[in-house]
Amino acid sequence: METANYTKVTEFVLTGLSQTPEVQLVLFVIFLSFYLFILPGNILIICTISLDPHLTSPMYFLLANLAFLDIWYSSITAPEMLIDFFVERKIISFDECIAQLFFLHFAGASEMFLLTVMAFDLYTAICRPLHYATIMNQRLCCILVALSWRGGFIHSIIQVALIVRLPFCGPNELDSYFCDITQVVRIACANTFPEELVMICSSGLISVVCLIALLMSYAFLLALLKKLSGSGENTNRAVSTCYSHITIVVLMFGPSIYIYARPFDSFSLDKVVSVFNTLIFPLHNPIIYTLRNKEVKAAMRKLVTKYILCKEK
C-alpha cells in the first residue's frame, strides 16, 4: 500500500435509502412499525426461556442466544437508520463507522456459527435421542456458544484490521444507510485488491462453508425422518423443526453470500438486500422457530397471563 501524504477523512456521508421526503416518511413508518412489533417478540422469547423452569433443554438455551444476537444485530443499524430519515445530511464519524462495522460483523458471524451449533443439537436429538442428554450437556452447550461468539469476534477483528490500515482522502460518500464495508473499501485512496480479497475469503468462507454443512446435515436428517414417517407425532415435530431451521438458514445466508461473497461492486439490489439482511430477516428468525414450537408458545402465553394480564387486573 502506498504511503503518500493525504488528508485523512474523519467522517462519512450516508446517502440513505431515499432522498425523497415523502418516501422517507413512508419508509420510516414501515420500518418503525416493523421494528417495534418484532423486537418485543424476541425479548419475550428470551424472558420466557429464562423464567420458565420447564424450558431447560439446550435447544431453548440456543434459541434464547439466537434471539439476543438477532436483537443486537438489527439494533446496530436500525435506530440510526430511523433517525436519519429526518436528517438532511446523514453523517457518521470514522470511529463510529469502524465501531459499527466491528459489531455488525461480530454479531453476524456469531449468529452463523450459532446456527451451525443448533444444527448439531438437532442432529443429536434426532439421531442419538438416548444419548442426547449426555452429549449435549450444559457444559458442552456453553462451550459451543462461547466458541460461536469467539469465532465471530475473530472474524470481526480481521475485517476491521483490514479497514483501518487503508487511507481515506476523499470522496467520503457511502451509497448506503449504514457503514457498509463494501462501500467503505470502494472509496479508499489505494489499491484495495489484497484487502478486498481477504475480506471476501473471510466472509465468503464462513458463509459458504456453514451453508453447505447446514444444508447437507438437514438433507440427511430429512431423509432419515422420511424413513420414519410412520412413527407418530414426534417424527412430525422433528420434520417441522427441520423446516424451521432450513427457512432460517436460507434467510440468513442468502443475503450474506450475495453481499459479501463476491467482488465489492455496486448493484441496484444492494440496498434492498442489505435491509433484509440487517433488519427484517434477523428479527424474524426466533419468531419462525417459536411459531413451530408448542412448548415455547404455551410458556409465552403463561408468562403473559401471569406477569402482564394479572397486573392489569
Curated annotation (Swiss-Prot):
Cytoplasmic side: 1-25, 79-97, 164-204, 260-270
InterPro entries: GPCR_Rhodpsn, GPCR_Rhodpsn_7TM, Olfact_rcpt, Olfactory_Receptors
GO CC annotation, single: plasma membrane
Chain ranges on the Extracellular side, renumbered to this chain: 47-57, 119-142, 226-238, 292-313
Keywords on record: Disulfide bond, G-protein coupled receptor, Membrane, Receptor, Transducer, Transmembrane, Transmembrane helix
Recorded GO MF terms: G protein-coupled receptor activity; olfactory receptor activity
Membrane topology of the entry: Multi-pass membrane protein
Keyword Disulfide bond: yes
Disulfide pairings: 97-179
Ranges that cross the membrane: 26-46, 58-78, 98-118, 143-163, 205-225, 239-259, 271-291
Pfam families: 7tm_4
Cellular localisation: Membrane
Keyword flag Membrane: yes
Function: Odorant receptor.
Similarity-based family: Belongs to the G-protein coupled receptor 1 family.
Designated name of the protein: Olfactory receptor 4M2
